[in-house]
Amino acid sequence: MIYAMSDIHGQYELFRNLMEQIPLGKDDTLYVLGDVVDRGPDSMKILKYMMANPNIIPIMGNHELMALPCLKLLVPELSNGFLHKLSSQARQSFAEWTLNGGISTIQEFLKLPQEERRQIVEYIESFRLYGKKIINNGEYWLIHAGLEHFSE
């Protein structure tokens, strides 16, 4: 069976409740269609759960896209003056991300040991841009939002 969900936004308890509703077996696949992170308090918990389950296929959402360059900068241990050392583009990326709910993700990410931070970043980097399935002779595209400049 193939399942899909999206826009979990750090809501681990709601995610776990949904997972209890899905009889996800070893031969089943769950596509998570983006926006796992931000807004809610438990983005890292959800990402770790997904990492531990190879039949969960993550698709990149706009929140992961905003988070990724910032999280890469947060992998090393932070030093005094961290913000002053950032380029103006990096500061702008952080500002945009925090305005879109990234603060909870940053706080949670910084509590992780450096090695776990690195693993989280590598995992998000592995997110697909889309999935494509053929079911009953129908072709289905699994994406977060839309395909820009798409034409048949």
Protein language model annotation of sequence segments:
Residues 7, 105, 144:
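A residue-level signal for conserved active-site and pocket-lining positions in enzyme catalytic cores
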Residues 4, 32, 58-59, 141:
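Residue-level marker for buried hydrophobic side chains located in beta-strands
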Residues 74-76, 145-152:
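Short, surface-exposed, charged loop/turn segments at secondary-structure junctions
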Residues 9-10, 64-65, 146-150:
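Short, solvent-exposed loop/turn segments at secondary-structure junctions
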Residues 10-12, 133, 144:
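Catalytic core of the metallo-beta-lactamase
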Residues 1-49:
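N-terminal active-site segment of His-dependent metallophosphoesterases
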Residues 43-47, 52-132, 138:
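Active-site neighborhood of divalent metal-dependent phosphoester bond hydrolases
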Residues 136-138, 143-147:
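Short, well-ordered beta-to-alpha junction loops that form the rim of enzyme active sites
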